[in-house]
Amino acid sequence: MAAEAKRTWPKRPIIYEINAWVWLNELSQRYDCPIKLDNVPSEEWDRLAEQGFDGIWLMGVWERSPAARAISLSTPAIVEECRRTLPDFSPEDVTGSPYSIHGYVADAHLGGRAGLAAARRALAARKLRLLLDFVPNHVAPDHPWVTEHSDYFVQGSQEDLGRDPASFLLASNGAVLARGRDPYFPAWPDTVQLNAFSPGLRNAAASTLKDIAAQCDGVRCDMAILLLNAVFTRTWRERAGAVPSSEYWREVIGEVRRQFPSFLFIAEAYWDLEWELQQKGFDFCYDKRLYDRLVHEGAGSVRGHLTADMGFQDRLIRFLENHDEPRSAATFPDAKGRAAAMVIMTTPGAKLLHEGQFDGARVKLSVHLGRRPPEPVNAEMRAFYRDLLRLVSEQQLLEGEWQLCDCQGWPDNRSNANLLAWCWTKGDQRSITVVNYSDSASQGMVRLPWRDLSSGAWKLSDDINRRIYEARDGNTLSTAGLYVSLPPWGYHFMRLEQVDAAAEDRRAA
């Protein structure tokens, strides 16, 4: 395992999120026997390895909280959501939120610590890395810290408890503690708020993370923004106490990295605080802004986003869905969804993909549930993602250099504004991606960055659409650009290769 801990991540990893509890439940049904992390059939690990991922995020492996589960079952809104999702819902389907953690040990239902170690070995044998959760902002009401280390938490008073019982709770040791929250929404009823300014809590968080780092290759840090000094002060004001001279994340990440230098930190980030979290030590931060642009805006907004500094973009993780967002198939019509996938998969940064996304799943599953309803598979979507992942992997695009391209139009045709275009270069390999991010047919001239195009002719192979285009004259490509005409939500994903003139002459003869 020591050797595994030293394995580094690629510069722009592709990560696949799996709901561990639900996945093992479905495998148990499929194989008609109890499946835990230590006896997942090898063909299931093989199936993951074949798809071109660099890491697997097993979401929700930590010990669930009995108290949190009871709160879930007694909260009408949660129960109603579960009933809408599962027509045959029963209370046994509720597992409690994986983000209300009872303890950072793999849940016995999933196979415990030994099962998690077996899963990591199985993944490592297939050159896959393991990503797990870390929830820095709060713990479950029955987490041992609540009674053993009340000083780790934001404190309240009896007056607070009487005035606002939804935001405070009485611990069994008599302490009044705040429930977890962010500055914009009511408190989460199944959580207790940790105090990011507590020196004891920071030490305990670093120790917890080092134990986690001994068991996996990285963590996705839930609501990481809430631990920033400025955000925590705005949320809790005088209850937070004196503002420390150092930031929580700089302190905690630095301590972990001293022992585990290659350990990966991903931040769930919002509110345009991605750059700030990157400066505190995070390898990647959620690119929620790009997601919102793809959902609600057009090509111009997306293009503007992609003009950001490359050092910033390369430390974003891009996605169309995850367990917090609606399913992409329910958000994007099929054609738009494929166009959006082309954008996130062929731009810089890490990629986050979600179990069920490739099959066109439409039901957003509550994190409180341990099973999901069956859904029909969208065979066209599955084939699209299979081909896209294969091509990105085969062409090793994410190891190269990326450049945004201009796309020009004509006085009487400004549809070029709908086109997004960029290039990748890796040694002699060149790739061009063009996406029509609109519901109208669009045309334009893509200006290519390569200075040596004028020497000879060039073949274009659009592998995602299984088309090979006639060779283009290099002088024209160099001066005027590449003419592109795409249907609504259409795309090209093309390799550019210089034609061997002598070989072409021999074939013609």
Task: Give, region by region, the residue ranges found by the protein language model.
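Active-site and adjacent substrate-binding regions of carbohydrate-active enzymes
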Residues: 2-509
